[in-house]
């Protein structure tokens, strides 16, 4: 979920989610080092502090810089880089309307993963996770569309250990690649893109940082969120981030819980 500030999730312009072929970068550390998508425009982990201060641009139009105005209900802040964005969100600022909510997409897809990469460790054990047609049965319910009653049901299903596929049996994979998984349930389309890999939680195994979006098939509804997942010994992907901005990492528990 985005915010608890009564912000509607219907925009006048639909968010278009596409599948892109991006290269990958890895840090210079030895073995099991963190890696990330080239879309982050990051050469090394040491460059993150500077990268956080660079004004963001649109993903589809790199020449166009992005600015958003966030509010806390009393005052507003004009934001154009990740450092200011994360500071504002952590302080309780949020988009004041649907248009601003749409414009925050570039920040959601870049700022949180840069934040978490700063503290990522080399992976000590385990393999690399890639999307497959089984991923819907491994993921918890995500990007749940509907009333508060429906979203609450999704949260309860996740606590019970249900998969996204169990919670929404109509959900079907429409496209799968190494880093992008797309699905549709007949009403909404979903896209999950792996942005980075590494040990983000200190558990010693690989975690994946993911940018996920839901788009209404016949409407302009949309929602985009940031996630970190760990693969458990039961073959499930456990969500390691809170379910609303600023998507803080949860206190670390066993990956097998």
What label would you give each PLM region?
Residues 28-200, 211-257:
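Beta-propeller-forming repeat regions
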Residues 19-26:
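C-terminal segment of classical bacterial N-terminal signal peptides
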Residues 1-14:
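Bacterial N-terminal signal peptides that target proteins for export
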Residues 203:
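Acidic carboxylate motifs that coordinate Ca2+ or other divalent cations, activating on Asp/Glu
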Residues 1, 22, 252-256:
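Intrinsic disorder/low-complexity signature
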